[in-house]
């Protein structure tokens, strides 16, 4: 386990059960200039030159939002697959560069939703704007500037938000790139435009330099080595869901969700994890299990390896499949998915 991971989880345990109160205290003291609300551990470590900036990353599905978050924080935190709508909730990533803490929000892709789950995902994406100092609108330069992207820009303008445009995937030749640049320059001259490649990292340093230049004097909300505030149970469920997306065909990945039902720390410093894959039909369960359980064993093995790589300790993973009809309309699952 890397030092960053150790610090991340140690911090969560130190303030377990009261992280919201801690964050509220930090914000209160940031506005008053006082440290009276903070725990002594934080008061003594408080530095007068600490700065913070929060950044929301929005855009269409598969435009590269999650890849950008992972690139900036230097860890694969947000799951990435070739399928659209992989990200279902807000994923918080954190990176501290010298005296500046950057808090990033990866969001579900914005599209024209149909079902209840899709509508909840899009609402979740828009809700993230309220927490951000900067809004990055990431645009896939390999595709035309379509009506959905126009609508996103128009809604941002209606909210008096001037987005920063990121033209992603510039490492691949595109017939649309110059036209998109010309359109944005002519119609949105007050917005900055950064051509980038989230995958290769091209121009990311310049983007980060701009982001940190907009940070304001404020105590950090997280420990210096934290990379996220997400619970480990949630991250483990996301890792398994990623493998389901990668190993199942067609529409099936959109018809399931994953919950971590049990997390048990064992004496040998390994962890036993029980997860439930929830599907809406018996036929979906049959596909996930595979012949003689071969498919779920494959998915379980790949998920376990990813968890061990991320968490840094041995994992004993047990997967179960349950059928819950119309789970997509159940608010209980939305709460678990944080949407």
From Swiss-Prot:
Residues 248-325 form the KH type-2 domain. Residues 196-198 are annotated as: G5. Residues 4-48 form the RPE1 insert domain. Residues 168-171 are annotated as: G4. It comes from the Bacteria. NCBIfam families: era, PRK00089.1, RPE1, small_GTP. This is GTPase Era.
